[in-house]
Design a protein with these regions (language model features):
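Extracellular-facing segments of soluble proteins and assemblies that are Gly/Ser/Thr-biased and enriched
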Residues: 58-118
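Short, charged low-complexity linear segments at domain edges
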Residues: 200-232
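Polar/acidic, low-complexity leader/linker segments enriched in S/T/G and N/D
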Residues: 1-72
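General secretory precursor processing signal
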Residues: 41, 140-143, 153, 238-240, ...
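Extracellular/mature segments of secreted proteins
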Residues: 74, 209-210, 255-257
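Short coil/turn segments at secondary-structure boundaries
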Residues: 4-10, 14, 141-143, 188-191, ...
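Residue microenvironments linked to proteolytic maturation
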Residues: 94-208
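Short Cys/His-rich zinc-binding micro-motifs
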Residues: 226-245, 249, 256
């Protein structure tokens, strides 16, 4: 297949509402192989373009997988994929212009990921604190120091490769903390969560590309309805991310999202 034909086919797939995962698998294999060949030739502009194309393919493919995981009520697996998509988007949007964003609807994926995440009941996360011996540049291998950095900028593309700082030389674990705003959102306590808000939406959507937006409302519930909730449990209001005794414990009525 000629290069132009391959790129046209991938472009058509990206602009379609197809949910056939085998098509995305084949497209990803093709663009990945092509990217490797172009990188070896040293064509930086084309390599960078192919990386962008590959990344938007990954984002779309992962979002389709996420949608059907949600339909199957595999909530945690979907949550993990949502975070991966969020990271992919953060890297991609640093390396594309407005025309690319509009053409491939990057803003749609960014907004829809945030919308799904807002419905999940996870409020507390585990966070690992560690001392990293050193970081190196993924492009040139240079050891990163405050006063001795290489020419490559973190998060930018170089010949179809993303510059990241790689933890090297081992690390020393210091602590595991419970936090409200984690670096890694997949580290959650495995509890019996209420996914009714997530399921309410997923059960009503027909396609991953159906547009929707959450609007949260509240209702007042008598404090007596929560007499069985321990004061050290998370507050039923689910808004403050505080334990019950530090939030709504002494109120006559509690505002409850529904």
């Amino acid at each position: 297949m000629k290069l132009i034909d391959m790129l046209n086919n991938i472009d058509t797939l990206l602009l379609s509402n197809s949910t056939n995962e085998s098509h995305y698998k084949v497209a990803l294999e093709e663009v990945s192989k092509l990217l490797e060949n172009i990188q070896e030739q040293g064509d930086e502009d084309l390599s960078n373009f192919l990386w962008k194309l590959k990344t938007i393919l990954i984002i779309k493919d992962r979002y389709i997988k996420t949608f059907f995981l949600l339909k199957d009520k595999k909530h945690y697996e979907a949550w993990v994929l949502l975070e991966r998509i969020e990271i992919d988007i953060s890297f991609l949007e640093k390396n594309v212009d407005e025309d690319f964003i509009k053409k491939y609807k990057l803003d749609f994926y960014k907004e829809i990921v945030e919308s799904w995440q807002s419905l999940f009941p996870y409020k507390i996360f585990f966070s690992i604190g560690a001392t990293i011996k050193q970081y190196t540049c993924s492009i040139c291998g240079h050891v990163i120091r405050p006063r001795n950095k290489c020419i490559h900028k973190k998060g930018k593309l170089y010949n179809g490769k993303l510059c990241v700082h790689v933890a090297d030389g081992g690390c020393e674990l210091k602590e595991i903390s419970m936090v409200k705003n984690p670096v890694q959102k997949s580290c959650i306590p495995m509890l019996d969560y209420d996914y009714s808000a997530v399921d309410f939406i997923s059960e009503r959507l027909q396609s991953p590309f159906d547009y929707w937006k959450p609007f949260k409302t509240k209702k007042l519930i008598d404090r007596s309805e929560f007499n069985t909730v321990d004061e050290n449990d998370m507050c039923p209001c689910k808004e403050s991310k505080k334990i019950f005794k530090e939030c709504c414990f002494n109120k006559e009525k509690i505002e409850f999202p529904h």
